[in-house]
Amino acid sequence: MAFRWLSFLLLALPVLALPQTSSKEAQSFGCSTPANIPFNDDKLPDPFLFNDGTPVRSLTDWSCRRQQLASLIQGYEAGTLPPKPPIVTSTFSQNGLTGNLTVTAGFPGNTTTFSSPVTFPNGTVPTEGWPLLIAYSGLSIPIPDGIAVLTYDNSAIGEQNDQTSRGVGQFFDVYGHNATASAMSAWVWGVSRIIDVLEVTPAAHVNTAKIAVTGCSRDGKGALMAGAFEERIALTIPQESGSGGDTCWRLSKFEQDSGDVVQQATEIVQENVWFSTNFDNFVFNISVLPYDHHSLAGLIAPRPMISYENTDFEWLSPLSGFGCMTAAHPIWEAMGVPDNHGFVQVGNHSHCEFPSDLNPTLFAFFDKFLLGKEANTTIFETNEVFNGTVWNPSQWINWTTPTLSH
């Protein structure tokens, strides 16, 4: 198997030390976060430019830029993610190694209640509580000892059967069936409410500073979205998320135009309700998006993320996944934590099956970021099976990577 390691891949992405002075830091009127801006570029947009074209030079700058990107992603494709509602309560029970967390959230006279089973490790509870993995629709990856698992019924929060699922689910029972939020945004809302109540439920013995999220396929898209928009998530693990996940819209279109049979934006909006209805207005003109999913993943930085893709399934957009995460990696690099971002792309297994020979890569991220152990997380690899389509970084990335000052 031929692996291409990150040290080779990012030669086209030089790191530039930029001046300490930042005009954005001097602005007293705050951070402008419009939901849409004039834009047109076939290349992957520079995540290190503010909406007005000035450069991001510091971590303080990035905090504003992150807000801008989050607003744009909601404005174009995700719909509005509402803040914590005034009512968020819970009950928790446990019998042996099995617990149940019930969350009630909403407004006076209009709440919804959902429950999640929790499986706890055997052994003595750590002083700060167990690390927790939130698994969309159930667990599809192996986990090391010492991590609790909460099974999240995200489809109850935002239904995802087909286009008839628009506005259906417990989130929409609270916010209205015409709410702009996509199903994936609704899922993020549910994850946030789970974390809200765990923070004030000591009986659950969960370390809320060590919460991870994962999911596969459509749920992998959701896990990535949760990691991007919920900053209390300590580790994000999308598995085979494909189009609308850790791939980029522009690159998937390129694959399709090159003769590969992949899922691109024009098709995905007809399949389900993972994106807002507003996204329909842009899927035939992707170049007007002032971001792509390298920037969606970049919202997670500097928090850790590792994603997995499967080249046996062409429709997952293998070149797009690799290229998109190659373009995302400089965001962690600019913050001085490149080993907080990993990517693994192999084949020879079924969709959502996790090959055991990949366990060391996954466990390294669990060990380092949830269990507090020493581990090497410099992991970025592909088998380069792109079905004849050629990845050329200079075709898509015409920006350089700054070193963001503190």
UniProtKB/Swiss-Prot annotation:
Top-level enzyme category: hydrolase
SS bond list: 31-64, 216-352, 248-324
Entry protein name: 4-O-methyl-glucuronoyl methylesterase
Organism name: Phanerochaete carnosa (strain HHB-10118-sp)
Protein purpose: Glucuronoyl esterase which may play a significant role in biomass degradation, as it is considered to disconnect hemicellulose from lignin through the hydrolysis of the ester bond between 4-O-methyl-D-glucuronic acid residues of glucuronoxylans and aromatic alcohols of lignin.
Family as reported in the entry's similarity comment: Belongs to the carbohydrate esterase 15 (CE15) family.
Catalytic activity: a 4-O-methyl-alpha-D-glucuronosyl ester derivative + H2O = 4-O-methyl-alpha-D-glucuronate derivative + an alcohol + H(+)
GO biological process, one term: lignin catabolic process
InterPro entries: AB_hydrolase_fold, GCE-like_dom
Pfam families, alphabetized: GCE_fung (PF22244)
